[in-house]
Amino acid sequence: ELSEENPAQTNDTTIGETALYIYTSGTTGLPKAAILSNRRYLIAADMSSKAGLNCNANDRIYLCLPLYHATGLLLGAGAAFASGASMFVRRKFSASNFLREVREYNCTHMIYIGELCRYLTNIPAQADDASNPLHSIMGNGMRPDIWMDFKNRYGINRVCEFYGASEGNVSFANLMNKDMTVGMTSAEVAVVEYDVDNDEIVRDQNGRCQLVAEGEPGLLLGKITPDTVFEGYTDSEATEKKVIRDAFADGDAWFNTGDLMRTVDVGFNLGY
């Protein structure tokens, strides 16, 4: 039986306090403990449930990703907690059992990573693969070369691909359901020239970063502001290494995502 009152400690908890630590994947160095605040958790859970998956208490989320990583924990379990949806939680992904479980447990939504979708695309096709309750999925790393095949084969209506890092201050989400994109962001970002061979940002004669031409690949930076806070790592030295200072003006600060991106024309622009 639940108490009608919040626990006493909630009076002393703020949105900026640390909720948990999540270790980064280690793609740009050794894994580091990233700090996730209550703010980050609540924003991610709310965004996933309402704007990404668009799920409610009548839905069920198929979740086979580890809960010690942000995708499974924040976008999967977080969406269920925020919306009231139920979850089918599998300890380990199984391509051979996937469709049977989706049908048996009436899963309407799924959280994915790209490799999971590739495995499901590569297994032998069956005539009734699209005959299942799954209609909306959210995750990251869906490759363009399998995107449409996977979507059509399994009868998926909505693929909400997202981009973000456990420690990052900006994220993108394909909220408008535009195929083969990571969508959009409301945060202030910059795509700047980057020398891949020398692994360094290209700066002009004044020491400033240079924006790439429209559609050209470049390094993604996210401006650090009161609204887009870089919460960093438990290691302050590692935190500082990810900050690009004086990029476009004296005193500015930007989070270095370490990822190359390019813009694509989807037929419209959104203003904020």
Predicted features by range, described:
Residues 82, 99, 104-113, 121-196, ...:
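Gly/Ser/Thr-rich phosphate-binding loop
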